[in-house]
Swiss-Prot record:
Interacts with CYBA/p22phox. Heterodimerization with CYBA/p22phox is essential for its activity and cell membrane localization. It is found in: Cell membrane. Residues 285-395 form the FAD-binding FR-type domain. It is an enzyme of class 1 (oxidoreductase). It catalyses: NADPH + 2 O2 = 2 superoxide + NADP(+) + H(+). Residues 35-51, 125-167, 223-395 are extracellular. Activated by the ototoxic drug cisplatin. Activated by NOXO1. Cooperatively activated by NCF1 and NCF2 or NOXA1 in a phorbol 12-myristate 13-acetate (PMA)-dependent manner. Inhibited by diphenyleneiodonium chloride. Its main location: membrane. GO terms for cellular component: cytoplasm; extracellular exosome; NADPH oxidase complex; plasma membrane. This is NADPH oxidase 3. The chain crosses the membrane at residues 14-34, 52-72, 104-124, 168-188, 202-222, 396-416. One of its GO terms (molecular function) is heme binding. Residues 55-284 form the Ferric oxidoreductase domain.
Length: 568
């Protein structure tokens, strides 16, 4: 079992542990450096260990902010995916977990930002208290430095008769830190699954606060509020000898007044590369936005699904890819992802859109799919398309046997795949590694996806005509029905075609017994590498992942299930 788990999750776990290890190393190394570095000895007298907590978390923040944009650089990921020479097997599957890594890094940013904020609140209070009459001895002497000419200050809070909020808003670090914190809270809270499903538009717009976040981060350290003793001062001022003789600093030659300077800002050095890379992503998107998209066909399905056929010069796709669509008439900023439902062999590319939010509802209305007459081609709203971008499903043809599982709306990515399989099977001269496909479709109401049932019916007919019915084995499971449907199904059970879908393969009612299904597939294909591809809810994803671990053989010559989850 452990060997099978390593087969699917080993590399992912190594990468996550490496990320954690780098974070821990950076934090611990920086923490102890600031705890022991001689140039920050007097700073520690005022701030104590919270100096090290603030600086260590700041470095980890910089590291994670450097990483956060890379997983969402779609063109970069698609380029790496297309370069199969340097990206094969398990490494290739890691690209499909880009959003998971993006979220993981975001949690790292949130944790380190919290530590950084709390530590600096303590630092600010310590700076403020050090200017009070209660502060005595070396602490008071250090806080008074900078009050006379030719002295540099250590304590940025210059007077006690003030409050910490005022002092916070007087500094570049304070203002930008506040902006960074607010931006981070907005981004994190609007990224919850509930918000994304209830209002994708809110998620989309608030996520663009990242521009403010990165700008503020780049200038956050320019105020140089955390100060340490200069190297020239250290060579003249022996801390071990002079720290207890602070009253004699101006009179004893061996103890000149220590001089301090702020640390140079470094955050911009960490984020410059990824920001430039992401800026290139946006430039490419703008360039594609300018390209003309011709809408060749609009189909309004009875189930409330809008099918759009489009053409665009130079557009090349692979089955399973997706595009980003913008409709300037609805919003000039929003781009929404849709899986391509056409095959590469067709002379157009298509998407199927179901109303699932304000933007999609407005799009269906604009195209006349909400009970209105369909628009004339010349009056259709303009669409812009960015992509296509690769996903896990593009790797289907790398396996001899594939298990494809779709749940609900997750069936959409498999439309292009099944079409492409048909075209490849029809072309005798095309070498095809894939020899068997098991397709499972689980839905609550098949009528909501009539267009897909029609596609399956067409494929079934064509496969039968070509004598290749063995190539595709499909299983449809209906999880929701009422008494009238049950009675209707029972009355027509003996007919040659299914009463719900019209297919020769009868619909099952309930949910699959995945243990039985995987056991049978493993029995049918011993010593095979089987790709399992899924698009749907998380609960079912965990079940399928478990099945892949359970039924993969520890023997290298046995059957192996490789799990791939669709995400975009």
């Amino acid at each position: 079992m452990m060997g099978c788990w390593i087969l699917n999750e080993g590399l992912s776990t190594i990468l996550v542990l490496s990320w954690l290890g780098i974070n821990f190393y950076l934090f611990i190394d920086t923490f102890y450096w600031y705890e022991e570095e001689e140039s920050f000895h007097y700073t520690r007298v005022i701030l104590g260990s919270t100096l090290a907590w603030a600086r260590a978390s700041a470095l980890c923040l910089n590291f994670n902010c450097m990483l956060i944009l890379i997983p969402v650089s779609r063109n970069l990921i698609s380029f790496i995916r297309g370069t199969s020479i340097c990206c094969r097997g398990p490494w290739r599957r890691q690209l499909d977990k880009n959003l998971r890594f993006h979220k993981l890094v975001a949690y790292g940013i949130a944790v380190n930002a919290t530590i950084h904020i709390v530590a600096h609140f303590f630092n600010l209070e310590r700076y403020h208290w050090s200017q009070s009459e209660e502060a005595q001895g070396l602490l008071a002497a250090l806080s008074k430095l900078g009050n006379t000419p030719n002295e540099s200050y250590l304590n940025p809070v210059r007077t006690f008769p003030t409050n910490t909020t005022t002092e916070l808003l007087r500094t570049i670090a304070g203002v930008t830190g506040l902006v960074i914190s607010l931006a981070l809270v907005l981004i994190m809270t609007s990224s919850t699954e509930f918000i994304r499903q209830a209002s994708y538009e809110l998620f989309w717009y608030t996520h663009h606060v990242f521009i403010v976040f990165f700008l503020s981060l780049a200038i956050h350290g320019t105020g140089r509020i955390v100060r340490g003793q200069t190297q020239d001062s250290l060579s003249l001022h022996n801390i071990t000898f002079c720290r207890d003789r602070y009253a004699e600093w101006q009179t004893v030659a061996q103890c000149p007044v220590p001089q301090f300077s702020g640390k140079e800002p470094s955050a911009w050095k960490w984020i410059l590369g990824p920001v430039v890379l992401y800026a290139c992503e946006r430039i490419i998107r703008f360039w594609r936005f300018q390209q003309e998209v011709v809408i060749t066909k609009v189909v309004s399905h009875p189930s409330g699904v809008l099918e759009l056929h489009m053409k665009k010069r130079g557009f090349k796709m692979a089955p399973g890819q997706y595009i980003l669509v913008q409709c300037p008439a609805i919003s000039s900023l929003e781009w929404h992802p849709f899986t391509l439902t056409s095959a590469p062999q067709e002379d157009f590319f298509s998407v199927h859109i179901r109303a699932a939010g304000d933007w999609t509802a407005a799009l269906l209305e604009a195209f006349g799919a909400e009970g209105q007459a369909l628009q004339e081609p010349w009056s259709l709203p303009r669409l812009a398309v960015d992509g296509p971008f690769g996903t896990a499903l593009t790797d289907v043809f790398h396996y001899p046997v594939c298990v494809c599982v779709a749940a609900g709306i997750g069936v959409t990515p498999f439309a292009a795949l099944l079409k492409s399989i048909w075209y490849k099977c029809s072309e005798a001269q095309t070498p095809l590694k894939l020899s068997k496909v098991y397709f499972y479709w689980i839905c609550r109401d098949a009528r909501a996806f009539e267009w897909f049932a029609d596609l399956l019916l067409s494929l079934e007919t064509r496969m039968s005509e070509q004598g290749k019915t063995h190539f595709l084995s499909y299983h449809i499971f209906l999880t929701g029905w009422d008494e009238n449907q049950a009675l209707h199904i029972a009355l027509h059970w003996d007919e040659n075609t299914d009463v719900i879908t019209g297919l020769k393969q009868k619909t099952f009612y309930g949910r699959p017994n995945w243990n039985n299904e995987f056991k049978q597939i493993a029995y049918n294909h011993p010593s095979s590498s089987i790709g399992v591809f899924f698009c749907g809810p998380k609960a079912l994803s965990r079940t399928l992942q478990k099945m892949c671990h359970l039924y993969s053989s520890a023997d290298p010559r046995g059957v192996h299930f490789y799990y791939n989850k669709e995400s975009f």
